[in-house]
Amino acid sequence: MKATKPPKVTIRDVATASGVHVSTVSRALDPARRKRISKEVLELVEETARRLGYQPNRAASALRTGRTHTIGVLLPDITNPVFPPILQGIEAAAAARGYFVFVANVGDPQLAQPILARMKAQQIDGLVMAIALREDPLIDFVRDSGMHAVMVNRADESGRLPAAVSDDRLAMKLAVDHLVALGHRRIAHLAGPQTVPTGVGRRQGVEQALRDHRLPAPRIVECDSYSREAGQQAMRVLLESGGKRPQAVVCCNDLVALGAYDVLRAAGLRIPQDISITGHNDMPLVDMVDPPLTTIRLPHRELGWQAAEMLFQAIEGQSLLASTVVLRPELVVRASTAAPAAA
């Protein structure tokens, strides 16, 4: 005998069981309007809805409100340890407001616009982007589409979109100041790709910090990506470039620093006895490599949270308190840096 499906629980059923009006239940279960409901009534309605197994009709809600309570997130490389905590922050902020997060990993920048067009077709309410290059046409594409959007971890240098970022220049100043305090004078930089704002900002931070200390301009090798392999290649180029070997190397991120470790070990050079190394990001496990990496710690989860909160403010028609939110980095000193050996 075929089992009969139980009748679908409606918003009217929740209202009757809660002893409140249907409109009260509607507001209580709408993330955009629930702030108008008292805490006691909100808890009562939510508990009743859970007990009865009520599932809101998202399609009907979207038709009524013009919102799907879904946001999109574009990431360049989900395997990069920087991005999972950023995504966690975005998801936490979204969950607190009853939003669903639609994530796309965009490994190839050429795919960004087609993916974004697909998200727009799904009627997302807004977008958090961590993928934009410098002078990226994607930013104009987003703006022309009329979509609410916020950048995270990378800022648009022209200010076309709001952003939540860390202070890349300050981060590099902290690393350089630490090395100079140890006695280093010949400091090199394995720079991030100059096609992305973070690569440019960190390079400028190193250059300015050395000028502030009245030290020679750094020897710079640009990495073609933020990867361990790129760090290996850049470190080889630096060692083969001739002249006096640098006493210390400021790396644009931790993966690049680990690539530098590989090449220095293969060359028979010791860290930090022969050369000091600093990273950037404080990704998981860099405190367990040999030697543990001195690096810059960033509030990645908070970056994600802030970006999402800025997006929700825009979606709800609120004025942003700032077009760019800048969070402060922190130096974490470990065993990969020490005073230089006597010349």
Feature annotation, model-predicted:
Residues M1-P6, R51, A92-R97, R143-M151, ...:
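Bacterial carbohydrate/catabolite-sensing allosteric modules
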Residues M1-R67, A343:
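N-terminal helix-turn-helix DNA-binding module of bacterial transcription factors
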Residues A17, V22-R27, R64-D77, H178, ...:
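Short beta-strand segments enriched in small/hydrophobic residues
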Residues K39-E43, R51-G126, Q204-E207, C223:
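Amphipathic helical "hinge" segments at domain boundaries
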Residues A60, Q113-L116, I139, V176, ...:
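Short hydrophobic/charged patches on amphipathic alpha-helices used for structural packing
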Residues G107-Q110, A130-E135, L255:
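Short beta->alpha connector loops
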Residues R134-R143:
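Active-site-adjacent beta->alpha loops and helix N-cap segments on the catalytic face
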